[in-house]
Amino acid sequence: MSFRKRGEILNDRGSGLRGPLLRGPPRTSSTPLRTGNRRAPGNVPLSDTTARLKKLNIADESKTKMGLDSSHVGVRPSPATSQPTTSTGSADLDSILGHMGLPLGNSVLVEEQSTTEFHSILGKLFAAQGIVHNRISDSSADKTRNGDTHVIVLSLNQMFAKELPGIYKGSRKQMKKNLISEEESKVTVQNLNETQRSTPSRYKDLKIAWKYKLADEKRLGSPDRDDIQQNSEYKDYNHQFDITTRLMPAPIASELTFIAPTQPVSTILSQIEQTIKRNDKKLIRIVIPSLLHPAMYPPKMFESSEIIGLMHGVRSLVKKYYERVVLFASISIDIITPPLLVLLRNMFDSVINLEPFNQEMTEFLERVYKSQPGKIQHGLVHILKLPVFTDRGEMRVLKSEWAFKNGRKKFEIEQWGIPVDDAEGSAASEQSHSHSHSDEISHNIPAKKTKISLDY
């Protein structure tokens, strides 16, 4: 340990003692300040400012970045990730996907485990929703847009366009009410003095009858504020379709493009990309109904090298034009091998599996809902992959949580619950009751004397 003197300067190569500081006038530097090409504020030319702003590229990002108009009726932000999302045509399918639709640049595969074709209904709904979006924008005031949605169908079935479902207009009673309300809304000489019909007389005569009005509103049901706000902001985002009607008029070539899957893979991919480029600034919805159907695909397409090459190319196009392309495909998994199915699932961002009920389960549901046939469900819905969430590593796999039913008017997906058969329960209770009653009788009646003879 070393000690230094109090006046010694540390790390000084000069003298050891530190003298007092000398104060004097400030020194003037011999080198002038480097001012450069400074200008007074306000003397910058306007041309230089405009040139700098152009380099910043602060234009309308909704058109340059997304490739779509910000006012597109078929696009809304995802409530989970805020990504631009479009509807699949089924509100229930939009809900279980987790984004209220399918995010742009993503794909969904709907697979079915039997020979039924419930998946074809979802494919038609997906295509019909795109046609409706295109016609809504085409009927706007801006006639130069010529629509903002285009549908590409990879299929040989030319009747697919004529089989698209129409928009649900309500029941017969609701349609009659709508016609009556439209007639009453028209201003004519007859209904000028009939405006009092809109308010029932009991609300005018009895002041205390306001509570009956509230009771009627509760009975009829009123939507929540959030639902009202969402519906008012995105009123044309999703539509309810009637699968018993047809979309009229049928889609034309400017709205829907057919591509034959019997062509070579390179030709199919080039035609898809040309269609995407030709319909610039439009939302492209690619539909592949009944993938690998033997009636539409050649035998060589069932080889893994061919079909995986096709789906890999389509997936690359979806990711290349991610700002305005979505993909929907459906397949029956009974006609392909399990290894090929695994490879196909890896090509899609989301996978939904439909498992129709067998005959025994169908008969059980028909017996349980004998008085309510509208509640009969037709199968289970399994969620194997979800868009965006699965890519993030979130294992959102749900099996036997949802069920689907193909109703008279629409395709529905709802939560699954095993129903209780009241007939079996009542029969079991009656049997147990009769058994207990016979036991009571046997206990009350004295036992008869029995005589047993033993012969040796």
From Swiss-Prot:
InterPro entries tied to this protein: Elongator_complex_protein_4 (IPR008728), P-loop_NTPase (IPR027417)
Stretches with biased composition (Low complexity): 18-27, 77-90
Protein keywords: Cytoplasm, Methylation, Nucleus, Phosphoprotein, tRNA processing
Claim: Signal is one of the keywords in the record: no
Biological or metabolic pathway of the protein: tRNA modification; 5-methoxycarbonylmethyl-2-thiouridine-tRNA biosynthesis
Modified residues (Omega-N-methylarginine): 13
One Pfam entry name: PAXNEB
Gene3D superfamilies in the cross-refs: P-loop containing nucleotide triphosphate hydrolases (3.40.50.300)
GO BP annotations, alphabetical order: regulation of transcription by RNA polymerase II; regulation of translation; tRNA wobble uridine modification
Molecular function (Gene Ontology), one example: identical protein binding
Domain of life: Eukaryota
Record field: compositional bias (Basic and acidic residues): 1-11, 57-66, 432-442
Additional free-text comment from the UniProt record: Present with 358 molecules/cell in log phase SD medium.
The family this protein is said to belong to: Belongs to the ELP4 family.
Function: Component of the elongator complex, a multiprotein complex which is required for multiple tRNA modifications, including mcm5U (5-methoxycarbonylmethyl uridine), mcm5s2U (5-methoxycarbonylmethyl-2-thiouridine), and ncm5U (5-carbamoylmethyl uridine). The elongator complex catalyzes formation of carboxymethyluridine in the wobble base at position 34 in tRNAs. It functions as a gamma-toxin target (TOT); disruption of the complex confers resistance to Kluyveromyces lactis toxin zymocin (pGKL1 killer toxin). May also be involved in sensitivity to Pichia inositovora toxin.
Name listed for the protein in its UniProt record: Elongator complex protein 4
